[in-house]
Amino acid sequence: MELNVTTKDNSSTIFSFIAVSIPVLLGIFVFMVPFPHTTTIKEICFYLSVSLVVVLFLARKIKLSFQTPLAIPGLLFVAWCFFGLFYAVNPANSIHDFYSHLVKYIILYFIVVNFFSSIRKLSILSWIIICSATILFVWRLYDFYVILGNPLATRFGACVTEVPTNLIGIIAVISIIFSITNIFQAKDWLRKIIFLSVLLPAFAVIFLTQTRGALLALFMALVSLLSGRIKILVGILLLVGGILLVSPAGERFTNDVTENVRIKQGLLVWEVVKDYPITGIGFGMQTFAGNLDLQSYNEKLSEKFRRQEILLNPHNMYTDITVRTGVPGIILFLGVMFSFFRMMWRLKQNGTNGSIASWATAVFAAGIPFFVIGFFDPVFSHYPESILCVVFAMGTVLWRIHEENKSSMKV
């Protein structure tokens, strides 16, 4: 995005300052995402960014672009969610969450796409994510194992509310992916060592939380990222496998999955879906626990599952979307997912230069943890939504650079 300033006077200086301020504010927002008691700072950064974009747009100093391969599937999903508001069980909660957990992040997505419009800016954005995650990991690990005195065999938990234990693996895997990418791209040893050092707390968090979803997401993301560097991939996987063999995390894969309460919850959610198959119960996240008679749905299950605990949310991203937006809603959401990964796959294979292909590989891998961990846990909260929004935006920026390069080659 280029600022449309033709004269150098006081007003042009002000507009230039505003344009520079927007990515700074967004950078602060992204950095603060996982930290507690920073809601005010994040809200100020977000709404101030939106206001400044509006000022520049109304003054005709910028031309916003909304071109993206995600536009059509995304618009269809948003339109269906909006349509479902008219049939929501709890309209107030659904309207609130429709804005807070969907529209707001679409706005954030397009601002990031328009103001982080170069490979250099994407690199800086990845540094912000890595730095924020590393500080969070070191702080929480130190607090849990040193200050509180828990032994290392104790499952890492008691995380801040913005980052529950089961979801911290999302940012940990993304931090690892971006750190490895920056190691490959760094030209000096100092930078390589810095990015190498931040891998330790990220890996520690994944193993100490002992969550199957995070471990599976790590495996799949590493395979995706390093498929072209087989020796490095094999070395890392052997190291990860060795740690699993001697750590309590390995025992998580030997537990009897048939006793997992998530199976019962999936069956219970299916009973709800059968009553609301088209538009779902509404987009509101509190509707499932607050407005449905879950005990009556529990009575429809077999005796084995009736005895198990009733969870207050679907505990799975895909069943969560299905119960809130109906069967058409989950189909449209899967369409958004497919469009994102197809876009990244094409850039991996046919990027107009090595930087685009390299970053497309990283962003493809960075999208994996959200959708893998989503099989095991409810991931729709502001922290993972913000990260997913940024990852989608990074992918779109790469697509735009690729398209611009193709156009310039034809001239």
Question: Model features per residue range: what roles?
Answer:
Residues M32-F35, G242-E251:
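Transmembrane signal-anchor helices characteristic of membrane glycosylation enzymes that use polyprenol
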Residues Y47-V54, K231-I232, V363-V411:
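Transmembrane alpha-helices of multi-pass inner-membrane enzymes
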Residues M1-N93, S117-S123, W127, N182-I193, ...:
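Transmembrane signal-anchor hairpin modules in multi-pass inner-membrane enzymes, especially those
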